[in-house]
Amino acid sequence: MKTQFAILMITVVLMQMLVQTEGGILGKLWEGVKSIFGKRGLKNLDQLDDSFDSDLSDADVKLLREMFK
């Protein structure tokens, strides 16, 4: 029983170490993939940045008001 508990504790510690370093490892792998393909191969697919633009023009406000009538 003591041996099983010791093996369980060692396994838990090793799994925690793996989970904590996994982000760093996967991040480095992704940087390597991005460097292989370059900027042209991998474009920024996050198109939500434009939807959070805080500067609304008068035309934008007018369009929004017409949409929500």
UniProtKB/Swiss-Prot annotation:
This protein's record includes keyword Secreted: yes
Propeptide segments, given as residue ranges: 41-69
Location within or outside the cell: Secreted; Target cell membrane
Primary location class: secreted
Activity regulation summary: Antibacterial activity is decreased by serum.
Modified-residue entries (Phenylalanine amide), positions: F37
UniProtKB keywords: Amidation, Antibiotic, Antimicrobial, Cleavage on pair of basic residues, Cytolysis, Membrane, Secreted, Signal, Target cell membrane, Target membrane
Signal peptide as annotated in the record: 1-23
Tissues in which the protein is found: Expressed by the venom gland.
Keyword Secreted among UniProt keywords: yes
Domain of life according to the entry: Eukaryota
GO cellular component: extracellular region; membrane; other organism cell membrane
Gene Ontology biological process terms in this record: defense response to bacterium; killing of cells of another organism
Protein purpose: Antimicrobial peptide that acts by inducing concentration-dependent membrane disruption, implying a membrane-lytic mode of action. Acts with potent activity against Gram-positive bacteria (MIC=4.04-16.16 uM) including methicillin-resistant S.aureus (MRSA). Its activity on Gram-negative bacteria is controversial.
Family note: Belongs to the non-disulfide-bridged peptide (NDBP) superfamily. Short antimicrobial peptide (group 4) family.
Domain-level remarks: Amphipathic and cationic peptide with an alpha-helical structure.
Protein name: Amphipathic peptide Hp1404
